[in-house]
UniProtKB/Swiss-Prot annotation:
Ligates lysine onto the cytidine present at position 34 of the AUA codon-specific tRNA(Ile) that contains the anticodon CAU, in an ATP-dependent manner. Cytidine is converted to lysidine, thus changing the amino acid specificity of the tRNA from methionine to isoleucine. Belongs to the tRNA(Ile)-lysidine synthase family. It is an enzyme of class 6 (ligase). One of its GO terms (molecular function) is tRNA(Ile)-lysidine synthase activity. InterPro entries: Rossmann-like_a/b/a_fold, TilS/TtcA_N, tRNA_Ile_lys_synt, tRNA_Ile_lys_synt_N. It comes from Mycoplasmoides gallisepticum (strain R(low / passage 15 / clone 2)). The lineage of its organism: Bacteria, Bacillati, Mycoplasmatota, Mycoplasmoidales, Mycoplasmoidaceae. This is tRNA(Ile)-lysidine synthase. The gene is tilS. Its EC number is 6.3.4.19. Keywords: ATP-binding, Cytoplasm, Ligase, Nucleotide-binding, tRNA processing.
Length: 287
């Protein structure tokens, strides 16, 4: 991740403390800010105005996507909202000719994600959030993963920077919110101990994880190489995560059965997305 003063980044800004902090710290390097108003809660317009006021004051170009209140979400809201969000980042990046995006995930987000993954009994080689990832052609950077939420709030309060609070973050509807509530009851030392547990797991699996990433750098989509690998499940997890497809061990086992049968040519991964066999080659296709 470059840290020059060149205006090279797109940034996602919700109006909450994390993204406002990130915007304030990187404002000189921001080419365009993106805000999505899902119109799902009474304070949505307030957050939009917080973002637009900050960008106007600091002369930062801003693109706003306002989702119709009547928009029908046909599946998990958070999953669909994420797709809407990142598709908007992608199209805005193309418009402004920028392919690097800043996201305000911090140390608490890392820990919450790691706990969610661990609680699902997913035997992963990496828990938490990556400093760098990608969404299609867009490079994603998370420069706040070394900061706790409390540190972000202290900065904003000290500098009297306005931000909004998303009240849906406190609803027990979502598993992440339940984990967040439980973590809020811990001391800083206890939270750090939980974090250290996952960092140690990641360190222990570092060599194996690198070998899984290296596999894809030379893989020619021959599915025999995939199913014959001792890291089959981890390979599939990484491949799916890069293509925004949910992974489960049961799905991986069903795919293994599909690949071992000669007659079947396609496997449904999610609505409109299939795994297609063409000879010994394998690809993910939207139909």
């Amino acid at each position: 991740m470059s840290t020059t003063n060149k205006k090279q980044y797109l940034i996602g800004v919700s109006g909450g403390p994390d993204s406002i902090y990130l915007l304030d710290r990187y404002q000189d390097q921001i080419k365009v800010a993106c805000h999505i108003n899902y119109n799902k809660r009474p304070t949505a317009l307030r957050d939009q105005l917080i973002v637009s006021d900050y960008c106007l004051k600091n002369k930062i170009p801003l693109e706003i996507l306002s989702v119709s209140p009547s928009y029908q979400y046909h599946k998990n809201f958070q999953d669909q909202a994420r797709k809407i969000r990142y598709d908007f980042f992608l199209s805005t990046g193309l418009k402004y000719q920028v392919d690097q995006c800043l996201i305000a995930h911090h140390k608490d987000d890392f820990l919450e994600t790691a706990i969610m993954q661990y609680d699902k009994n997913q035997e992963l080689l990496f828990y938490g959030l990556h400093q760098e990832s990608s969404y299609q052609s867009l490079k994603i950077f998370r420069p706040l993963l070394n900061l706790w939420k409390d540190e972000i709030l202290s900065y904003l309060e000290q500098d009297k920077i306005v931000y909004g609070v998303d009240e849906s973050n406190f609803l027990s509807t979502y598993q992440r919110n339940k984990i967040r509530t439980n973590l809020s009851k811990l001391s800083q030392e206890q939270k750090q101990a939980r974090l250290d547990f996952f960092l140690e797991l990641n360190k222990k699996n570092q060599v194996r994880y690198q070998s899984v990433k290296d596999f894809f750098s030379s893989w020619d989509c021959n599915y025999l190489d995939l199913i014959n690998s001792l890291e089959y499940y981890n390979l599939l997890y990484l491949w799916f995560s890069k293509n925004n497809i949910k992974y489960s061990k049961q799905k991986a086992e069903n795919i293994l059965s599909f690949l071992q049968k000669k007659n079947n040519k396609r496997f449904r991964l999610k609505a409109g997305v299939y795994l297609i066999k063409e000879g010994i080659k394998l690809k993910i296709v939207k139909l």
